[in-house]
Amino acid sequence: MGLPLTFDDNNQCLLLLDSDIFTSIEAKDDIWLLNGMIIPLSPVCGDSIWRQIMVINGELAANNEGTLAYIDAAETLLLIHAITDLTNTYHIISQLESFVNQQEALKNILQEYAKV
C-alpha cells in the first residue's frame, strides 16, 4: 500500500483510501483489529439487503475473512477482521491489502442492494 502508519494515543490508525474507503487499525496487545466502513445503513431498510448481508457474513466466516457488524449508534455497516500474527511484516501488509480489497468489493456490492 505504500502508506506510513501513524498510531494516535488510543493506539488507532485511521486510513482514507481512494477518497471513499475508510479503514481503522486498532493496535491491541497481541492483535491488530481492522474496521472498515462498508455503507451507511438504516435499521429499517428492506429485507433483501439484510438477507444479502447474512449470506455474505456466512461466506466471510467460512473463509476466515472477517465479519460484518452493524453499528446501531452510527447506522453503519462495518467489516471487522483481526490480524493475529504480528511477527511477519509481509503477512501484515498482505492481510491489510486483502482487507481493503474485500472492503471495497463489499461496498460496491452492498451499495447496489441499498438502492433497491
UniProtKB/Swiss-Prot annotation:
Q: What InterPro entries does the annotation carry? A: SicP (IPR044530), Tir_chaperone (IPR010261)
The entry's function note states:
Molecular chaperone required for SptP stabilization and secretion.
Q: Which GO terms describe its cellular component?
A: cytoplasm
- What is the official name of this protein in its record? Chaperone protein SicP
GO biological process, alphabetically ordered: protein secretion by the type III secretion system
State where it is primarily located: cytoplasm
Q: What else is known?
A: The structure of the SptP-SicP complex contains four molecules of the chaperone SicP, aligned in a linear fashion and arranged in two sets of tightly bound homodimers that bind two SptP molecules. The SicP homodimers do not interact with each other, but are held together by a molecular interface formed between two SptP molecules. The chaperone-binding domain of SptP does not adopt a globular fold for interaction with SicP. Each SptP molecule is wrapped around by three SicP chaperones (two chaperones from one homodimer and a third one from the opposite homodimer pair).
**Record family assignment:** Belongs to the SicP family.
Places the protein is found: Cytoplasm
Asked whether the UniProt record includes Hydrolase among its keywords, one would answer no
UniProt keywords (A-Z) are: Chaperone, Cytoplasm, Virulence
